[in-house]
């Protein structure tokens, strides 16, 4: 019951985010376009507890998010990296930059579908 309520609320949140992003691009949206972008509803929850031997830690690895939107809630440990498309003061082009966690904040990743 709790998982179904979570799915319902998170699906609406993702829809609202997509509508805001695409709307800012000046694209008129209707339900068929939104359904095409969002595809089949999917929720994936990953939890990585602290490893007593950090040198043995294995994460998801370098990847891009294939869907439209990924919503992340980081813990205080961190481990989220972003590949830099352009050079800036923090990292060079093509380098991976760690994104430090902000307590209580959600990270919104734009996936391959929208990109």
Question: Model segments located where?
Answer:
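Peripheral, non-catalytic segments flanking oxidoreductase cores
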Residues: 1-115
């Amino acid at each position: 019951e709790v998982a179904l309520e979570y799915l319902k609320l998170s699906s609406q949140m993702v829809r609202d985010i997509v509508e805001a992003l695409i709307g800012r691009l000046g694209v008129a949206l209707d339900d068929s376009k939104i359904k095409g972008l969002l595809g089949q509803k999917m929720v994936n929850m990953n939890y990585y507890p602290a490893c007593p031997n950090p040198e043995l830690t294995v994460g998801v690895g370098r990847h891009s998010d294939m869907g439209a939107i990924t919503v992340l809630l980081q813990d205080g440990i961190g481990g989220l990296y972003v590949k830099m498309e352009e050079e800036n003061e923090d990292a060079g082009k093509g380098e991976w930059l760690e994104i430090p966690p902000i307590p209580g904040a959600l990270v919104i990743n734009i996936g391959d579908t929208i990109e």
